Design a protein with these regions (language model features):
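Walker A/P-loop NTP-binding motif of AAA+ ATPase domains
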Residues: 1, 46-203
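Single conserved hydrophobic/aromatic residue that forms the stacking wall/gate
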Residues: 1-6, 10
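Conserved ASCE P-loop NTPase core motifs with emphasis on AAA+ ATPases
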Residues: 12-42, 46, 53-56, 146
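Hydrophobic transmembrane signal anchors and adjacent membrane-proximal interface regions, especially
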Residues: 9, 14, 106-108
């Protein structure tokens, strides 16, 4: 069994190792997703194709825009996109192919292991993902994101306040994340308006 000090050293090494590809486990509730298909295999309407090309441009040129052009002083790093549509319309495939086209790993967050009924646990579970991902060039894909990013409730009970605290925490972590975050939902109207205002693209 690792000592506490040894465990802390191991955690620091993992956090700093940019080539580290974690396996799906209780300590990292996300799974790397891949596909044998290619970008050209997707069938897209003009608007969606345009939105995805804009994302491609950001992935390939975002670092140059933010750092070389000095825009990091006035713009937050990172890119946030909402994919919506009925099941089977290609939301997961689009996210996976964005990663494949740009040689970036895509991790699908397992919300069943993230969301907890115990106060503070959902935030801790999210922190595990964001802490590991923030120094790596990953795409984080939240499928069926309504479970975490749905409309907030009025604060009539302690449970309501707890739920809204989770939303506030999520907003902060997503805004501070320097990489790509994709939220997927079956219905666009299910996503809280506070999140919707923070998306650079909606497809």
């Amino acid at each position: 069994i690792k000592s506490s000090a040894a465990s802390d050293v191991y955690k620091r090494q993992v956090l700093l190792d940019k080539e580290y590809k974690p396996d799906y486990n209780i300590g990292f509730p996300a799974k790397r997703i891949t596909t044998q298909l290619e970008w050209e295999d997707m069938v897209l309407d003009y608007q969606v194709a345009t939105e995805l090309e804009e994302i491609n441009v950001w992935i390939s040129s975002g670092k140059t825009v933010m750092e070389d052009w000095g825009l990091s002083r006035i713009l937050k790093a990172g890119y946030r996109s909402l994919f919506y549509g009925p099941p089977g319309t290609g939301k997961t495939l689009a996210a996976t192919l964005l990663g494949k086209k740009n040689e970036i790993d895509v991790y699908r967050i397992d919300l069943s292991m993230i969301v907890s009924k115990y106060i503070g646990e959902t935030e801790k579970n999210l922190a595990k993902v964001f802490d590991l991902a923030e120094n790596r060039n990953w795409i984080l894909f939240f499928d069926e994101a309504d479970a975490l990013f749905g409309k907030r409730t009025s604060t009539n009970t302690s449970n309501d306040r707890h739920a809204n605290q989770e939303v506030a925490y999520l907003l902060q972590r997503i805004e501070d994340f320097p990489g790509m975050v994709i939220l997927a939902t079956n219905l666009r109207s299910n996503i809280d308006e506070a999140f919707s205002r923070r998306f650079q693209s909606v497809s």
